[in-house]
Amino acid sequence: MEGPLIEIVTDPFPSDDAMQRLWLAAWGGAGPTSFEPILTRSLVHVGAYDGALLIGFVNVAWDGGIHAFILDTCVDPDYRRQGIALKLVARAQEVSRARGALWLHVDFEPHLEAFYRQCGFGPTAAA
């Protein structure tokens, strides 16, 4: 439950065990065997912690230029509906801009549209 111990951390490089625990709780299945190759190539990744426990995560992949992509936004079900995902995405947006991303993209399932609109995302047409 959110309280004064929830901390949003930029580029925390969580352990594979911490990521696997969160991945299983949030997605219902195992994640990649190792997250290191993913995280070391990210423009930024952001974690939410309750003390030492990783309870939320978002990753931003990029093309090495001006386009970046929000991926894997998740929060442990015991901590959902407290604004943690909004804080994760907001930090990811802020750091992505500071690191040179001019375009930040996200693909999502239809039931997440309201959430991503609340984060400031909207549809764009390819030119």
Briefly describe each language-model feature range.
Residues 1-33, 127:
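Short amphipathic alpha-helix that is part of the acyltransferase structural core
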Residues 34-74:
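A conserved beta-strand-loop-helix scaffold within acyl/acetyltransferase catalytic domains
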Residues 66, 102, 122:
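Short acidic/polar active-site loop segments enriched in Thr and Asp
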Residues 76, 109:
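Residue-level recognition of the GNAT/N-acetyltransferase active site
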Residues 81-94:
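Conserved acetyl-CoA-binding loop-helix of GNAT-fold acetyltransferases
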Residues 96-108:
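Conserved GNAT acetyl-CoA-binding A-motif
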Residues 117-127:
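Conserved acetyl-CoA-binding loop of GNAT-fold acetyltransferases
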